[in-house]
Amino acid sequence: MSTATLVVFPPPPPVPIPTYITSLGLGYSIAIALGFLVLISTIILSSYICCRASRLRFSASAANANANASFSDRGVIVPRIIFVAEDDDLESGNVVVGGLDHSVINSYPKFHFTKDITAVVNGDGFHDGEGRETTCSICLCEYMEEEMLRMMPECKHYFHVYCLDAWLKLNGSCPVCRNSPLPTPQSTPQSTPLSEVVPLSQYAADRRRSRR
């Protein structure tokens, strides 16, 4: 009787992975890592530029606010006023522009406004007066306590110092009544009365918003 013999063969060796496949996977990993670093760097740089620009804009606005505040006198902000005449059909040859000298404007009397003001300035000093205005006819803002005002010497109309100074540099007469302190009418051209002038100013709106 014959005996069967069982022969066991060893498993075949594993197939070797080509080296170019291994190097290709390493290259992909390096490329992905570099791309990720570039993306992160771009985001950080963009954020820095945006923050820098925002700070510069804030610094510029703060500098402008400080410059405007430096011209204030007891709470009065220098107004930026543009006067536009409603009747623009006049020929340019007939329009005469003139104003007063700085020394003449400075010679006009100044005083501090009070709520119970009952005196106006004349050539001899103070005397009682009635019907005093509480609103500047140039900037259309109410006078605040202790604000510095300047008065026209003839008609006794008074306004904010900066408002009247800016007006008199361009016009030699009162903004309300056209009265001129100069003796000869030829030396001071007739200016557009305030009732026919439209003041375009941010001063009034800013003052009203600040009081709310």
From Swiss-Prot:
Record's superkingdom? Eukaryota
**Zinc finger map (RING-type):** 136-178
Ribonucleoprotein among the record's keywords?
Answer: no
Zinc is among the record's keywords: yes
Mind listing the GO molecular function terms for this protein?
transferase activity; zinc ion binding
Q: Extract one GO cellular component term from the record.
A: membrane
Could you tell me what reaction this enzyme catalyses? Answer: S-ubiquitinyl-[E2 ubiquitin-conjugating enzyme]-L-cysteine + [acceptor protein]-L-lysine = [E2 ubiquitin-conjugating enzyme]-L-cysteine + N(6)-ubiquitinyl-[acceptor protein]-L-lysine
Pfam short name (any one): zf-RING_2
Please give the start and end residues of each transmembrane region.
24-44
Q: Region entry Disordered: which residue ranges? A: 182-212
In short, the EC number is 2.3.2.27
Q: Where is the composition biased (Low complexity)?
A: 185-195
Q: Which Gene3D superfamilies match?
A: Zinc/RING finger domain, C3HC4 (zinc finger)
Compartment list = Membrane
The entry's free-text remark on domains says: The RING-type zinc finger domain mediates binding to an E2 ubiquitin-conjugating enzyme.
Q: Which family does it belong to?
A: Belongs to the RING-type zinc finger family. ATL subfamily.
Name this polypeptide is given: RING-H2 finger protein ATL68
Task: Report which gene this protein is encoded by.
Answer: ATL68
